């Protein structure tokens, strides 16, 4: 791995994730399990560690116990040469209050910046699914001479109204930063595409510190990185865009190169899982040259008995399928599917139990959900709406530990 001692990583992991309820009823959004073996935060941490950035502070707040534990247990570094990945809860250094926004989270944690004294700071979000080599973005930032560089992903202009949008000139300088505009701007080379902000930033340290301090004195500010800090630096002529399509990740296939998903809603979370299950997946979990690291448990291998069958599915360790059928689904560890049961197009998190003859379709079942014998989920949505959360796209979501 490449060592970058002059770079400090700050991961913003305090998100509440209300639109992912009930998956966020008992945990922070970055701690939500994903992909059968990971949590959402594992993607950004894997990208940073794979790039050689080994001084990382993860700023946490909302229901952070499971997230703090996951970071402490899964992401231990040796401590050699000052390497660390450490969760940092709200420290209330500026009075008895929690973070009021992502910029305020950094303000309250500036002691970490002063202690490390980095030349550059990468500030990344913790709840997106993607692969990226951050070092390439840092090098682009250094060469551009900008105070801040914002990662932008090209999305069709007709869909860009749902994102923070970047209007840039041909040199890459950002001239406007627009939050969910009705009429998104095109890119300099393609009027039909728009740069959407990925929520990933590289700052020259002094620029970030000065901007954070100035924002803290603005009583009209929401103290948000994307809503306040970046627009202020755009207005000051300090901001440039980094085109995500230029980021080349080792081992990436033509099919999954440039993949990035905001999984902030139940439908988006579900769709991102369905991206994993095909023979040639849109997002490939099996890239050994740029691995996604997750929690490792001492579990037995998955087991299929009495004709148990899984097709186009991801099946985690410790799962047992007994005379059951699973199709187009993602099963996390220790899931048991009993005889005659059918699971189709679903996401089952660790410890889920599916009883004999049960049917589960287009559903997300959180940890330790138990579906009784003969139960049917995802077939009659009107009935399901009386019992569970059902997304706009018709995905049934059942919270942790529910017995049905």
Swiss-Prot record:
PROSITE patterns cross-referenced by the UniProt entry: ADP_GLC_PYROPHOSPH_1, ADP_GLC_PYROPHOSPH_2, ADP_GLC_PYROPHOSPH_3
GO molecular function terms listed in the Swiss-Prot or TrEMBL record: ATP binding; glucose-1-phosphate adenylyltransferase activity
UniProt binding sites for alpha-D-glucose 1-phosphate: 99, 164, 179-180, 197
Keyword Nucleotidyltransferase: yes
Class of this enzyme: transferase
Domain of life: Bacteria
The UniProt record lists the keyword Cell division: no
Keywords from the UniProt entry: ATP-binding, Carbohydrate metabolism, Glycogen biosynthesis, Glycogen metabolism, Nucleotide-binding, Nucleotidyltransferase, Transferase
CDD domains the UniProt entry points to: ADP_Glucose_PP, LbH_G1P_AT_C
EC identifiers of the protein: 2.7.7.27
Reaction equations catalysed: alpha-D-glucose 1-phosphate + ATP + H(+) = ADP-alpha-D-glucose + diphosphate
Pathway(s) this gene product operates in, as recorded in its UniProt entry: Glycan biosynthesis; glycogen biosynthesis
Disulfides per UniProt: none
One Pfam family matching this protein: NTP_transferase
BP GO terms, sorted: glycogen biosynthetic process
Family named by the database record: Belongs to the bacterial/plant glucose-1-phosphate adenylyltransferase family.
Its job: Involved in the biosynthesis of ADP-glucose, a building block required for the elongation reactions to produce glycogen. Catalyzes the reaction between ATP and alpha-D-glucose 1-phosphate (G1P) to produce pyrophosphate and ADP-Glc.
Assembly and binders: Homotetramer.
Protein name: Glucose-1-phosphate adenylyltransferase
